[in-house]
């Protein structure tokens, strides 16, 4: 209903109803999860913010997250407890660990873990890497992002690999994509494929057009369009996403 209201109010479409294409997977479909970390009663907890607040509600499991997420989250919290590494306190600006970020390739099965922390060098990083790999052997990249900004910003501006290349790859609509921590990628892989194919159908490209893809992220839509248009141009403000997009164009033989 919100989408319908927005289309009518903002787009002036005059629609009475929308046909919904339902998702085939209701559980475990989300390929990315971000847990804020917070000190509660003398121990670090990770979960999700309570609605309208910055108070973390600890969780044991979330049905829509990747299967590996629980083990990774628990491993990080155990590491924090073992080495007395404090969670970041948004009010005082003290403490270290801010967020646990996990991204998993739906097709590739590759998994990236990114730790956001309020420091330039992550203490006990070797022990953290060992703990995560022991808990989730399919993790292929572990990254530390220094984030000393005030507030609750999730990621910093730089990404330092602790293990692996610092990115994962996945396949979408027959194309292979490199995915870095800061780059946008649709969180529901299967529905993204349905969405992209429907967009291509509506575009009805003949092979002569120049297509502009604004806020292109890693270039997923841009490259899907490039196969059917005369020329496709992606525009993005996130530097890491652009680097991924250029690499993805090369990987798929679609670079100019």
Question: Model-predicted segments: where are they?
Answer:
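SAM-dependent transferase fold signal centered on methyltransferase-like domains
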Residues: 1-160, 201-208
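Rossmann-like S-adenosyl-L-methionine
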Residues: 124-256
């Amino acid at each position: 209903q919100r989408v319908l209201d927005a289309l009518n109010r903002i787009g002036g479409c005059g629609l009475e109803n929308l046909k919904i294409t339902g998702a085939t997977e209701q559980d475990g479909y989300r390929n990315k999860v971000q847990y804020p970390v917070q000190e509660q009663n003398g121990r670090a907890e990770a979960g999700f913010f309570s609605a309208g607040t910055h108070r973390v509600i600890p969780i044991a499991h979330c049905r829509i997250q990747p299967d590996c997420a629980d083990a990774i989250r628990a491993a990080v919290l155990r590491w924090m407890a073992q080495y007395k590494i404090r969670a970041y306190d948004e009010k005082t600006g003290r403490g270290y660990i801010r967020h646990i970020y996990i991204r998993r390739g739906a097709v590739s099965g590759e998994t990236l873990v990114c730790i956001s922390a309020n420091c330039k060098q992550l203490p006990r990083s070797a022990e953290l890497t060992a703990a995560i790999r022991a808990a989730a052997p399919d993790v292929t990249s572990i990254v530390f992002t220094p984030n000393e900004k005030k507030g609750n910003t999730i990621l910093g501006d730089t990404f330092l690999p602790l293990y692996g290349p610092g990115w994962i790859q996945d396949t979408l609509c027959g194309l292979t994509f490199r995915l870095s921590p800061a780059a946008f990628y649709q969180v529901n892989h299967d529905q993204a494929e349905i969405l992209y194919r429907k967009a291509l159908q509506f575009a009805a490209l003949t092979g002569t057009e120049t297509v502009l893809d604004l806020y292109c992220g890693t270039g997923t839509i841009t490259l899907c369009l490039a196969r059917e248009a005369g020329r496709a141009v992606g525009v993005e403000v996130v530097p890491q996403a652009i680097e991924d997009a250029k690499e993805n164009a090369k990987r798929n033989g679609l670079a100019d």
